[in-house]
Amino acid sequence: MSKTIDFTTPRQRPSSRDVVAAPKACPLSSRAWERRILVFPLLISLLGGCAGRPENVLQPVAVTTNDISRVDMLVATTRKHAADPGELYSGERGTAISLNNLTVSIPPDENRKVGEVQWPKRVPPNPEKEFAVLKDEKVSSEQQALNWFRKNRNAKRQVIIFVHGFNNTYADAVFRFAQITHDAGTDAAPILFTWPSRASVLGYLYDKESTNYSRRALEDLIIQAARSPDVGDITILAHSMGTWLTAEALRGIAMREKTIPAKVRNVVLASPDIDVDVFRRQLIEMGPKRPQFTIFASTRDRALEVSRWISGGVNRVGGIDTTAYTDVLKSLGITVIDTSTCLLYTSPSPRD
């Protein structure tokens, strides 16, 4: 019998034993956290617009210096091809999933601030001071994808899949994921899943429908990655509206395959823009053998307040008062990091 999951009744506030990392000395300001944590505060600026940025910044450039860093990523998208090669893909919906292998250069540490994307001021970009694309190759066969996995796998065969949020161009998603991968110091093979967003604050409803449009494609990507012998561990990192797409894809996989692949071990949801009632149902339908979920939430997230208003006043998972739901979240094996207070609540994985 399925266990009832209730987010509607707040639980008692946590005792001191529940609080693992606490208050005033928030560790997120330290250099170590800046370079190691995957999502906070690296994702905080994702929702912002891109006014004033040059277009067509993805045209590959040549570099003559060796002091830059490189991130080699596989990019899967349901976007429509753009007419300009410097844009690659637009915000409109494509008819099939497309794969590209991109190499992004990141300026030397002395020329940038950790946690930020140094956007090109003009085209072509200056790799010494700005993010730039060094290589763009179309991946048109399964063998090419397998070759990429083998080239980029680490000793533990770890993969990280990033699903961006609302209001992102293709370039936004590519540069931001490159920044997260580099600044987190991870050597997991990076895969970006980017869905059709019109990159407009007025495009919320179009973007939401685009996540539904892209659900099956993300399911297929996760399943194919899990089936690869070159992959041993998958972490999924999603932000904002991308968390809805991620949760729906995992739910769909569980229903199609009867269970979520065991290789999908960690799912990180940053500022999840998901109706709390819907999230409850998604968790139930994922089944008992779910991955370990970590949620970054804040009652001060203004973007989620707007989403809550648009969605009929129903709380978003990323905007709930986590201290009021400690017991129920722990019972579900969910770890919560409250970014408004820097409190961390840990729970064992449902698979433990």
Residue ranges of model-derived segments:
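Bacterial N-terminal signal peptides that target proteins for export
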Residues: P10, P23-L38
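Bacterial N-terminal signal peptides
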Residues: V39-L46
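Serine-dependent carboxylesterase/thioesterase catalytic core
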Residues: A51-V63, T78-R79, A83-L99, T103-S105, ...
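Aromatic- and Gly/Pro-rich amphipathic surface segment
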Residues: T95-R150
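Proline/glycine-enriched tight loop/beta-turn segments at coil->beta junctions
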Residues: R153-R157
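Short beta-strand element of the alpha/beta-hydrolase
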Residues: Q158-V163
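Conserved small/polar residues in nucleotide/adenosyl-binding loops
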Residues: Y345-D352
